[in-house]
Amino acid sequence: METRKVKLAVDGVSKTFRVRGGKYQEDYLLNVLRRLSFDVYEGEVVSLIGESGCGKTTLLRIIQGLIRRDAGTIRVDERPVTGPGRDRGYVFQQANLLPWRSARANVEFGLELQGLSSRERGDRAQRLLELVGLGKAGEQFPHQLSGGMQQRVNLARALAIDPAILLMDEPFSALDAQTREVLQRELLRIKSETAKTVLFVTHDLDEAIYVSNRVIVLGARPGRVKEILDVPFSFPRPDLPELRGDPTFQNIRRRMWELIRESSAPARPEAVVERAHL
């Protein structure tokens, strides 16, 4: 039996934020993540889903090294994560492209600290723009691009540093439904062509099933793994409207909804915020 390589290992991660209570209120501690553990295997897409406030984005930023965890370990290719690094690419919800740079120059941005020549940077950026379907848009500036095109540039920029794992924080949530489905298909195509490992945060149940090999459902704050669901559909997959009619798709979606609905019940005692008495 073939052993799958663990690309990302999250083990016992916890995070608490201190919240300022205001002029007449005490500060308090907010437990966001509690002993959260899971693995992501090489070449797979894993989605994180759960109700708002369960810590999905916080976890992604901890993995990226933008926020310190309070407890637990994170490893990428067996190397501990101690801060930001080139082994992790981050795709934000908003493209946040530099408005004074062309699409190609935005993609080149992450390469400028790697000692590559101008020609090498330009060639790699052009290849990535072609990969995301924008081969002829390299000289256009962000204000000349649609929202969907800007997100393609955002993805190409994250891929430019050739990360071991791609972290995607609701990258399609601000797009209209049609553009969203187009980019979901594009993500699967790009994943197939690059064999990248992806950790994908979304609120959309259908999107989570469609793009993923597995879906991790997080419980309400403090976030922890409630259940990990396998998505058995092989790649390449039919378009999402067609897949929605599959009974297996419907069963997975129903189970995800049940788990999230359970999390919306009154909070567990350990999820209640704690007064800091500072």
Predicted regions and their residues:
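Helix-to-loop junction immediately C-terminal to a conserved catalytic motif
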Residues: Q64
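Conserved signature/switch motifs of ABC ATPase nucleotide-binding domains
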Residues: Q140-H143, I161
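Catalytic Walker B motif of ABC-type/P-loop ATPase nucleotide-binding domains
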Residues: L166-D169
